[in-house]
A protein has these predicted regions:
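Residues at the starts of beta-strands that form the adenosine-phosphate
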Residues: 1, 31-32, 61, 104, ...
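N-terminal active-site segment of His-dependent metallophosphoesterases
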Residues: 1-57, 73-74
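Short, basic/glycine-rich phosphate-binding loops at helix/coil junctions
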Residues: 3-4, 104-112, 149-155
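Active-site neighborhood of phospho(di)ester-bond hydrolases with catalytic His/Asp-centered motifs
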Residues: 4-6, 33-38, 62-68, 109, ...
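Active-site environment of divalent metal-dependent phosphoester hydrolases
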Residues: 11-13, 41-46, 68-76, 113-117, ...
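Alpha-helical membrane-targeting segments
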Residues: 17, 75-86, 159-168
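His/acidic metal-ligating clusters that form di-metal
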Residues: 26-32, 118-170
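Extended active-site neighborhood of metal-dependent phosphoesterases/phosphodiesterases
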Residues: 49-131, 136
Length: 170
């Protein structure tokens, strides 16, 4: 079993929800946890710290990807020049993989500093994800995790991309 969480929004989290997740994990022991973005409410140090402490306390493997709330909103300079610095300080790489007994999970960063409210992936990300999934043993369930629906910018969109997008579709 895999546990999927999203929009934890540490900084505005509700203790009753946190306790319910902890209790669920203790009772059911999922194979792994996937958190598909919005770990924090406002991308602040204390919020990332609290989220990391919480996830570590579950004592289960986990994969996280950033959400639009995980980059600074009001600190425009930081949003444009170092949007993921705190995220990376606590969770490392923006795009990771997690392999368990039954699952192979690819985390894709769909957040962009300029268009932070819309999901976006590049053709390079699509190709990289395809290559990762292409080499996974057939007995694994393959999953791709991201925060928002994908948006391909008009300058990268072309009918010739449809076969590429179709290849990666699960």
């Amino acid at each position: 079993m895999l546990l999927h969480l999203s929009d934890l929004h540490f900084g505005t989290e509700r203790e009753v929800c946190i306790q319910a997740i902890q209790q669920f994990c203790q009772q059911h022991r999922p194979e792994a946890i996937v958190v598909s973005g919005d770990l924090t409410q406002r991308a602040r140090f204390k919020q990332f710290y609290a989220c990391r402490q919480f996830l570590d306390s579950l004592s289960l493997p986990y994969l996280v990807v950033p959400g639009n709330h995980d980059i600074p909103l009001y600190q425009v300079w930081n949003r444009f020049f170092s949007p993921f610095v705190l995220y990376q300080a606590f969770f490392g790489r923006l795009e990771t993989t997690l392999e368990t007994e039954h699952f192979y999970i690819v985390g894709v960063n769909s957040i962009r500093r300029r268009y932070h409210t819309r999901g976006h992936i590049s053709m390079e990300q699509i190709h990289e994800t395809y290559e990762k999934l292409n080499n996974v043993p057939s007995n694994k369930i393959k999953l791709v995790v991201f925060h928002q629906p994908f948006y391909i910018s008009p300058d990268q969109r072309d009918d010739k991309d449809c076969p590429v997008l179709g290849k990666i579709a699960l």
